[in-house]
Regions:
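Non-catalytic pre-domain segments flanking phosphatase-related domains
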Residues: 1-14
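Solvent-exposed alpha-helices and their adjacent loops that cap or buttress functional pockets
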Residues: 3-5, 63, 152-156
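Active-site phosphate-binding/coordination module
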Residues: 26-135
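Conserved acidic, metal-coordinating active-site core of Asp-based
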Residues: 114-210
Length: 210
């Protein structure tokens, strides 16, 4: 960056988890005040996160963000204070997600499948570890969680991505197989869960989401 250039000519983009949020997954009030002060003085600031709107907005509603926020790792570009989605990337086809689920289930991993219709939902059949249960507890609080016997979706729902939660040992071979088969079709993120470090997340979206 050229520090002789007016910083107000740049757009500053921050992540949430492991960056702005504290260890309890909250945005401290003193951080809200500092960021708002910078925005009020002309700073162009926004957020890019793997969270969806229902999860991100309660954390960010105190910020005076004027630019659209990037949600779900680039699946949605959204006006923060209205919730209006102004851009969508490509979604994952139903046939494709069926192939992925059939692979994942051979490893005895329970997937969460994200959809978007009129609302955001996360469908799952069950949980088999504390990391996944912790995630269910979180998404149940904002009514996204939908426990089902089989993965079936309405004609109005589009599949925005999927999530696997388990230990690194369990997920590493899943990641290797999916990345080998579908690296041109999927963006795959494999990392430690910042809130439950003994578990890892394998989260994936359409290749055009970034």
């Amino acid at each position: 960056m050229d520090f002789t250039t007016d910083p107000r000519k740049f757009l500053y983009v921050s992540d949430l988890d492991g960056t702005l949020l504290d260890g309890d997954g909250q945005l401290p009030e003193n951080s809200v005040q500092r960021i708002n002060r910078l925005i009020d003085h002309g700073l162009n600031f926004t957020i890019a996160t793997a969270r969806n709107y229902d999860s991100a907005y309660p954390l960010l509603k105190g910020l005076n963000i004027k630019h659209p926020v990037i949600l779900f790792n680039g699946v949605y570009l959204t006006e923060l204070h209205t919730g209006e989605n102004i851009f969508f990337s490509d979604f994952i086809s139903l046939d494709f997600i069926r192939k992925v689920v059939s692979i994942v289930e051979t490893y005895n991993v329970e997937p969460f499948i994200y959809t978007y219709g009129e609302e955001h939902f996360a469908y799952y059949k069950g949980v088999n570890n504390l990391g996944a249960q912790s995630y269910v507890d979180i998404i149940s609080s904002d009514k996204r969680a939908r426990k089902v016997d089989e993965f079936t979706f309405s004609e109005h729902e589009r599949i925005s991505g999927f999530l696997l939660i388990d230990t690194s040992k369990v997920l590493e071979p899943v990641y290797a197989e999916l990345n080998s088969l579908y690296k041109d079709e999927l963006n795959i993120y494999f990392a430690r869960d910042v809130s439950n470090p003994q578990f890892h997340w394998l989260q994936s979206f359409h290749q055009q989401a970034s």
